[in-house]
Amino acid sequence: AGALGESGASLSIVNSLDVLRNRLLLEIARKKAKEGANRNRQILLSL
């Protein structure tokens, strides 16, 4: 039972790390998308 409890704890730690990483990746993707949109707008305005 002790070993099971330990693996469960490490599993939850891994899960929270995954959640954090996914949130970070989403944030980066959102920033890139916003920057890309701004760049496209500037290109259109400069034509």
Curated annotation (Swiss-Prot):
Subcellular localization(s) per the UniProt record: Secreted
GO MF: hormone activity
Entry-linked InterPro entries: Corticotropin-releasing_fac_CS, CRF
Main location group: secreted
Keywords for the protein's UniProt record, in alphabetical order: Hormone, Secreted
One cellular-component annotation, GO: extracellular region
Presence of the UniProt keyword Secreted in the record: yes
Summary of the function given for this chain in its UniProt record: Stimulates fluid secretion by the Malpighian tubules. Increases cyclic AMP production in Malpighian tubules.
Family: Belongs to the sauvagine/corticotropin-releasing factor/urotensin I family.
Protein name: Diuretic hormone 2
Organism of origin: Tenebrio molitor (Yellow mealworm beetle)
